[in-house]
Amino acid sequence: MAGQGSVRLTRKSDNVVIIEKDLATEEMVLSMGPQHPSTHGVLRLECRTDGEVVTEAEPYLGYLHRCFEKYCENVDYPAIVPYTDRMDYLAGMNSEMAYAIAVEKLLDIEIPRRVEFIRVIVSELNRIASHLVAIGTYAIDLGAFTPFLFCFRDREHILNMLEWASGARMLYNYIWIGGLAYDVPADFQKRVGEFVDYFRPKALELSRLLTENEIFVKRTKGIGIMPADVAINYGWSGPMLRGSGVQWDLRRNDPYSIYPELDFAVPVPDGKFSDVGDCLSRHLVRALEIEESLKIIEQCIEKMPSAEGFDPRAAVPKRIRPKAGEVYARAENPRGELGFYILSDGKSTSPVRCKARSSCFVNLSAMKDLSKGQLIPDLVAIIGSIDIVLGEVDR
């Protein structure tokens, strides 16, 4: 088959991408996934290609659909918490917190201060662990094996601490409506502080392993560029939106819990090292966010109230039957905004409707635009930069 020659991409003002090539070949339709290591789960992409150039990549979903929203209509409010763990199973604490905030808003109940601090600590630990998986698997997708080992080595320390606090390494069922399943162990703060001191130089070393790797930079810089206005129109959030240069983080722009009391930055690319909106920018945002999460954890350790006389279940309702009404609450998860819309009829102990707004689903919806005009090998870099979890996409 003849090569496609040089390829030129032109993005018009209405965001239509025009592909111009010196040579053309017969169009082929290739199926990538659902059993493919670089799709990070059971995702299938139907790719239309002209030689090595992708003209369209259509995602096909639903292979991991488990009826989450229907389950919610048939169980009590507290029984939904374990199901939220199984959406983004790499960031269960964050998902539990988003759901708990929604129901607590519906019930209009006040949460003890120590509970809020513990929630933020375990959520930020889970955020770091999730970003380590994203960075490690992204590296191995592009042929760099050592960073993968470094990421999973340090993630193990975090999982051990979360297991120490909650009893589980994943699928925690720890953040309850109104409180926590248990208080943290007596020297939890000391151990977390020691981890922060240990991990900060390791995070810098990990970042240098990739950003100073010429092959990694060439595989990601200028690939899968998404302009800020288009990202906003798609409804992107999290590192995907910030990678396009939009400084939007719910912890800062629509704060919840104790985040207004904490000092941290919202990193966005400046265009000096990467092309704003490309795969490399999205990777850099996740790497920089790890340091900000460490800052948040340090502040929480210093400010957390004493455990004297503390009952983690003091504000947990014995029976939950909210008054008739509806609520929407959202939180900044590692992959973006996770929101819950809950509708109560005032009679049942189960919600009439519980709708989950998944950041992974919304971010993945731009795959056609991201992939148009790219080379087939670059699809791997683009998918990895989105950092999807199919459990949350399909629900």
Curated annotation (Swiss-Prot):
It catalyses: a quinone + NADH + 5 H(+)(in) = a quinol + NAD(+) + 4 H(+)(out). It is a peripheral membrane protein. It comes from the Bacteria. One of its GO terms (cellular component) is plasma membrane. Pfam families: Complex1_49kDa. It is found in: Cell inner membrane. InterPro entries: NADH_Q_OxRdtase_suD, NDH1_su_D/H, NiFe-Hase_large. The keyword Magnesium does not apply. It is an enzyme of class 7 (translocase). Keywords: Cell inner membrane, Cell membrane, Membrane, NAD, Quinone, Translocase, Transport. Coiled coil: none annotated. Its EC number is 7.1.1.-. One of its GO terms (molecular function) is quinone binding. Belongs to the complex I 49 kDa subunit family. NDH-1 shuttles electrons from NADH, via FMN and iron-sulfur (Fe-S) centers, to quinones in the respiratory chain. The immediate electron acceptor for the enzyme in this species is believed to be a menaquinone. Couples the redox reaction to proton translocation (for every two electrons transferred, four hydrogen ions are translocated across the cytoplasmic membrane), and thus conserves the redox energy in a proton gradient. PANTHER family: NADH DEHYDROGENASE [UBIQUINONE] IRON-SULFUR PROTEIN 2, MITOCHONDRIAL, NADH-UBIQUINONE OXIDOREDUCTASE 49 KDA SUBUNIT. NDH-1 is composed of 14 different subunits. Subunits NuoB, C, D, E, F, and G constitute the peripheral sector of the complex. This is NADH-quinone oxidoreductase subunit D. The lineage of its organism: Bacteria, Pseudomonadati, Chlorobiota, Chlorobiia, Chlorobiales.
